[in-house]
Amino acid sequence: LSIRRQRQMCIRDRKKAFPPKLYDLTSLQREANRYFGYTAKKTLDMLQELYEEKLVTYPRTDSQFVTEDMRDTVEELVGKMPVLLPFLDYGQLGHNITRVINNAKVSDHHAILPTKEAVEKGISDLTADKKNLMMLVCQQLVQATGEEYQYEQTDIMVKCQGHDFTARGKVPVQMGFKAAGNAFKNQCVKAKPEEETEKETSIPYGYEEGMTLSPVKAEKTVHFTSPPKPFNCLLYTSD
């Protein structure tokens, strides 16, 4: 089916996304389930064991920040993350420790972090599940202290033969913290989380308003939605 362009609009914006926060217990349980299928109890049990082995800080925390007096400690930990996460390209990341510091949002215990002992001992002797959890905690530290992700987003709207067509494309400008997240998922996560499998309609880079569209081939396809998944304990921990 050839489509003849009649009217179009092109909107291009520079956008950015901010790094995620550090983990508290709830957010770590949720992410461990999302990436590895661990139940909340299994995650807590493993965290408790890692804590007793002095590889992570206290796990039963509801804070996602650290205090100002921990600035130097966190700075040192971030600098040593290549020891535990050698697959990351640290040249793309940069870091900003101030992002994770907020005295007002730390009560009894700060966010979950790897420890200096973890760097010294290494994690190669851990079970596969514990190693997954340790790398999840470590990569979150790198992401949370990373730079912003910046990208150029282009939306086009075309009016053709009485029908509206839209498409969106994104071109990364600065990967920032996402460089760590992507490397972690490629290295450590076998199955991609469902919410990340959706693809946006792609458009050619450099598209400008007023350009002539080449004829395109179109076809109709049939898709089916799936019923919601049964509730599990992790759903009740969501914000």
Task: Place the predicted regions along the sequence by residue.
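Single conserved hydrophobic/aromatic residue that forms the stacking wall/gate
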Residues: 1-7, 11, 239
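Short acidic, hydrophobic short linear motifs in intrinsically disordered regions
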Residues: 19-31, 58, 230-235
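Short helix-coil junctions and helix-kink-helix linkers
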Residues: 29-38, 238
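Short amphipathic alpha-helical interaction segments
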Residues: 38-49
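Extended, highly charged linker/hinge segments and catalytic-adjacent loops that couple domains
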Residues: 53-135, 175, 179-218
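TRNA-recognition modules of translation machinery and tRNA-sensing kinases, especially anticodon-binding
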Residues: 132-139, 153
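Structured, non-catalytic alpha/beta "coupling" segments that mediate domain-domain communication
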Residues: 145-195
